[in-house]
């Protein structure tokens, strides 16, 4: 199913009359024998089976939150000089001082609040999510991973493909102009061109909201902002043809998953159906997290204990975005990651203030 005109059955979305198959590589779904991100594998201790308690890990390579006092240096990660002191020899002075006070020479790479990361710090992607992880671990369903690029597309990955999920980088980075690749679904091109009334090659948040509404995909402005943030990796509040195509196909895939999970055809999915939907996307989350998601995205304030399609999309965007950011730091696929204060704030705030 690609596009959203009415079909002959189901929810009535899909421009091919319901008989046209979805894209050959639907985005953000668990494929083949790849276990969902967060599920148990025989070769990786990344997570325990669904609902089971997590065993004690014998590895101490990544300290867990709460294992030491806030601000204390991790045992295996000595602090590097702050950005302004890279060329100065560190002084023998312990990390400390009042929160927000100027850091001493030789302070950690946490540095003072607002300080940037070390310029020589590697991204920690290990080939990017979608590459084969170490120790034979699967790519967790390739959720967020970049598929193979089509040959000679000339568009940095090609339309119909999905952008590599690298580090978000600067949240205020500008978008690179792009165009539609040959063979792009004409409905997608027409939808974008109708929204791009000024012919700038970009559409803003209100234009995107209107374009999706024309295909009976009505979303709140908060959901639209989350879509733009995750598909552009920036807060530019505009989206080009390349990102719009990936977004369009992803929404198509997520609607298909919602329809399959809504077994009673109520137009809402409960906590068990949400669990199945997230597993289809490649995520195995705990019962506590599932209950929290349903409570958060239930329009009735938790009375129905179920979420509708538009809030399901926002739920998927939240789980997808936070998991990708966590995986950037979890380079060893250990289930643990270390964030400095600024990284943590930049990770969480876009989902709180979208």
Curated annotation (Swiss-Prot):
An example Pfam family from this entry, by short name, is EF-hand_5
Where is the sequence biased in composition, kind Pro residues?
Answer: 72-81
So where does Ca(2+) 1 get bound? 196, 198, 200, 207
Give one GO molecular function term.
calcium ion binding
Disordered as annotated region, ranges: 1-159
**Binding-site list for Ca(2+) 2:** 262, 264, 266, 268, 273
Task: Give the record's keywords alphabetically.
Answer: Calcium, Metal-binding, Repeat
Q: Which segments show compositional bias classed as Low complexity?
A: 1-10, 28-71, 106-117
Chain ranges of the EF-hand domain: 183-218, 249-284
Q: Which InterPro entries match?
A: CML48/49/50, EF-hand-dom_pair, EF_Hand_1_Ca_BS, EF_hand_dom
Q: What does this protein do?
A: Potential calcium sensor.
Protein name, as recorded: Probable calcium-binding protein CML50
Say which species the protein is native to: Arabidopsis thaliana (Mouse-ear cress)
Upper classification of the source organism reads: Eukaryota, Viridiplantae, Streptophyta, Embryophyta, Tracheophyta
């Amino acid at each position: 199913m690609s596009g959203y005109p009415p079909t002959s059955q189901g929810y009535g979305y899909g421009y091919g009359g319901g008989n046209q198959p979805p894209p050959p590589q639907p985005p953000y779904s668990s494929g083949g024998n790849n276990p969902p991100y967060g599920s148990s594998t025989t070769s990786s201790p990344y997570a325990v089976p669904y609902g089971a308690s997590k065993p004690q890990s014998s590895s101490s390579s990544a300290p867990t939150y709460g294992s030491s006092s806030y601000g204390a240096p991790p045992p295996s990660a000595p602090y590097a000089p702050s950005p302004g002191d890279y060329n100065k020899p560190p002084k023998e002075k312990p990390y400390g001082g009042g929160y927000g006070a100027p850091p001493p020479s030789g302070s950690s790479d946490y540095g003072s609040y607002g300080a940037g990361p070390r310029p020589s710090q590697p991204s920690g992607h290990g080939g990017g999510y979608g590459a084969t992880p170490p120790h034979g671990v699967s790519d967790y369903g390739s959720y967020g991973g970049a598929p193979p690029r089509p040959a000679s597309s000339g568009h940095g990955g090609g339309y119909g493909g999905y952008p590599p999920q690298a580090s978000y980088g600067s949240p205020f980075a500008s978008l690179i102009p792009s165009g539609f690749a040959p063979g792009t679904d004409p409905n997608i091109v027409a939808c974008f061109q109708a929204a791009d009334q000024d012919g700038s090659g970009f559409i803003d948040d209100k234009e995107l909201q209107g374009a999706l509404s024309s295909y009976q995909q009505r979303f709140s402005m908060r959901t639209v902002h989350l879509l733009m943030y995750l598909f552009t990796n920036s807060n530019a509040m505009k989206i080009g043809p390349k990102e719009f195509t990936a977004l369009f196909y992803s929404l198509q895939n997520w609607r298909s998953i919602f329809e399959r999970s809504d077994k009673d055809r109520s137009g809402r999915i409960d906590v068990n159906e949400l669990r199945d939907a997230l597993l289809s996307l490649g995520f195995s989350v705990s019962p506590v997290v599932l209950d929290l998601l349903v409570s958060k995205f239930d329009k009735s304030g938790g009375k129905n204990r179920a979420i509708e399609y538009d809030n399901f999309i926002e739920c998927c965007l939240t789980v997808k975005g936070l998991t990708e950011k966590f995986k950037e730091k979890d380079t060893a696929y250990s289930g643990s990651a270390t964030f400095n204060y600024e990284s943590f704030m930049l990770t969480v705030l876009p989902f709180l203030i979208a």
